[in-house]
Amino acid sequence: MRRTGVMLARPFDAKRLAKWPKPYILQPKINGRRARVIFGTLGNPMIMSSEGHIINSLPTLTASLKGLGLKEIILDGELYVHGWTKQEIDRVVGRSVTIHKREAEMQYHVFDLINGFPQSQRREMLYWLRLEQTSTGVIPVPSVDADSLEEDLEHWLAAGYEGLIIRHKDGLYQPCNEKARSDYLMKLKPRKLGVFPIIGKLEEESIYKEPKDALGAFLCSHEGQRFKVGTGFTRADRERFWENEFKCRNYLAEILYQELSERGVPIFPVFKRLVAKE
């Protein structure tokens, strides 16, 4: 069914990103049920799906939203519980006759406001709502300013999210009924998986380029081209890998990535695991 009233992200495009001003606004990409919450003049919340249907299956969450005391404002987010599958979420949210026994566990993760202000101002307005301090089950999605994507992509993938949302700091809210896919919003979800030979390791450095006696990244190769990939290891494991003799030639790195670059190396590589050569 066609969606309406919400802003939809374009697939990641490096050329488009290169035209955007820095810093970018980054958020984890969550895989829930998209929904707006519309507060009227009396402060009564209405949860509306991205297809324009009112959701009445979540009385506990609706009460929490009413407790926010908001009026004449529209929140944009997803009905979501971290660690639940999309099917589990749909089973709870999609009830139309009876209430699911786990409806009280459902949360609303808020990532934007719907109004006429630029993205950076919308984020500031959302911050001052102090949602995390006023209501149970209403959770602001974290956001960071960044000049590059790799570190945050790796962090949020490791935390169990499906990728990154990248926001143009000056972008206006463009509902999909006005613009099919927003010019100011992109999603990055690495989908390709491959194994690559490890040919070396690089030492971790401080921001002042001082060595830290720990593994910083593996050096890998593909078709004669070298590239590096972080590991996501704990500090203790990074120190252990650096101090101990690690025979790189005996292992491959399994890597999740967006696509191969023109020179044949993975774009936005994310380390998954070590694979012993047979």
Task: Annotate each predicted stretch with a short phrase.
Residues 1-21, 25:
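Conserved, charged/glycine-enriched, solvent-exposed linker/hinge segments
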Residues 16-136, 277-278:
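Covalent nucleotidyltransferase
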Residues 17-20, 27-31, 158, 190-192, ...:
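A short catalytic or substrate-binding loop motif that flags glycine-/basic-rich loops and adjacent residues
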Residues 28, 71-82, 168, 200, ...:
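Flexible glycine-rich surface loops and low-complexity tracts that mediate binding to linear polymers
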Residues 44, 206-219:
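Short aromatic-glycine-enriched beta-strand elements
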Residues 89-103, 107-108, 115, 226-228, ...:
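Intrinsically disordered, low-complexity regulatory tails
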Residues 140-195, 203:
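Amphipathic alpha-helical
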Residues 217-222, 228-230:
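Short, acidic/hydrophobic/Gly-rich beta-strand patch recurrent on exposed beta strands
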